Every structure is written in structure tokens, then in C-alpha cells.
């Protein structure tokens, strides 16, 4: 399974880095793809990530999953970029995976796919993302459409683990969670 995470200026760094790191721990290939004209991308809090590739330079058909992080400015850029919204619509039409967190489901809305979806998003964006059914879950996976959504920065851990679970199964997701000491943290937090 080959994945990409799309970064435009103003993405939420926690959501991007968590997904990239966890997928690499799970040995799931993930390309960091810039929607800019350069590989340099700057997050909402001024952190620079150098992308692996430019969106214009890749064969998007070769990817099994497209991932979009939130951060209001970054999500708005994704939603306004026709290359991105066309890619998201094509992924769903081809029965491939899409995963969006925080504000980035507005790109799903812009792609015209939310009317049939069940999902979630960052609080306050419900009026911009018109799901068939909205869920307040930490993450929500619409199995019929292969679309995973999540709420925001604090849910990025669970979002990334759910991506692993979807692509590589429960055992691999648990292995990564165990290595991160997540079960111990959850037990102590009670």
C-alpha cells in the first residue's frame, strides 16, 4: 500500500508529522507531497517540512491512499486547489482510500463527495462539511466509501493508528501503539 500526505502552506504540523512518523514506523510507504511550486512547506506554526515530491510531478494513480492534514489555512488551500479536489474525487471513484483530519474535510466537501459520507471534522466546521451523517467520534471510518476522518491535533495519534489498522490490520496498529507506550498512557490517564 502506497500513501501520500498533501501539504499546502498552513497545515497543522502535529497532524502531518504524527501521520508521517507512525506510518513509517509501520513500514507503510508515505510520500510527503507539496501542492506548492517548491518542496518547502511551512506549517501553521512556522515549522518547515521539506516534501519528497511535488504534486505536479507524480503519478497519482499509483497511490492507494491520499491523506490531508488540517490547520485552517492549509485546509483552505487544499479545498481551493482543483488538482487536490479532483484527486480526492478520483480516489473515491476508484474505490481507493482517503483520510482527512481536522479542518481538511472541507477539501472533501469541495471535491463533492460528502453528501454520501458519514464522518467527522474539527468542531465548528460542521456547517462547512455537509456529511450524510455527522459523528462526534474521535475518528470515524466510512467503510462503504473508504474514507477516514478525525477531529483535530489531539486525535492525530488515533487517526494515524486507524490508517495503519485500515491498511495493515489490527496487529500492526497495536504493535505501533505498544512501541509508543500508548496503552500505558491510556491506562494511567484512566
Predicted features and spans:
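Active-site-adjacent pocket-lining segments in enzyme domains
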Residues: 4-5, 11, 26-34, 52-54, ...
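Hydrophobic side chains within alpha-helical segments
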Residues: 16-18, 121
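Short glycine/proline-centered loop/turn elements that form peptide/ligand docking sites
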Residues: 17, 34-36
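Short, solvent-exposed amphipathic alpha-helices that sit
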Residues: 18-25
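Membrane-interfacial amphipathic helices and adjacent loop/beta segments
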Residues: 39-45
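Short gly/ser/thr-rich secondary-structure transition/capping motifs
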Residues: 45-53
Amino acid at each position: 500500500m502506497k500513501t501520500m500526505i498533501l501539504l499546502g502552506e498552513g497545515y497543522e504540523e502535529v497532524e502531518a508529522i504524527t501521520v508521517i512518523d507512525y506510518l513509517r514506523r509501520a513500514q507503510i510507504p508515505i510520500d510527503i507531497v507539496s501542492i506548492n511550486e517548491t518542496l518547502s512547506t511551512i506549517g501553521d506554526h512556522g515549522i518547515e517540512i521539506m516534501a519528497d515530491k511535488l504534486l505536479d510531478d507524480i503519478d497519482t494513480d499509483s497511490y492507494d491512499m491520499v491523506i490531508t492534514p488540517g490547520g485552517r489555512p492549509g485546509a483552505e488551500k487544499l479545498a481551493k486547489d482543483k488538482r487536490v479536489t479532483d484527486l480526492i474525487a478520483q480516489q473515491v471513484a476508484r474505490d481507493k482510500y482517503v483520510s482527512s483530519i481536522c479542518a481538511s474535510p472541507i477539501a472533501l466537501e469541495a471535491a463533492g463527495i460528502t453528501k454520501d459520507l458519514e464522518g467527522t471534522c474539527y468542531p465548528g466546521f460542521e456547517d462547512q462539511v455537509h456529511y450524510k451523517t455527522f459523528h462526534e467520534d474521535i475518528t470515524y471510518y466510512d467503510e462503504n466509501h473508504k474514507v477516514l476522518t478525525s477531529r483535530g491535533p489531539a486525535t492525530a495519534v488515533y487517526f494515524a493508528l486507524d490508517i495503519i489498522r485500515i491498511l495493515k490490520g489490527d496487529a500492526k496498529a497495536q504493535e505501533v501503539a505498544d512501541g509508543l507506550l500508548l496503552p500505558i498512557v491510556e491506562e494511567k490517564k484512566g
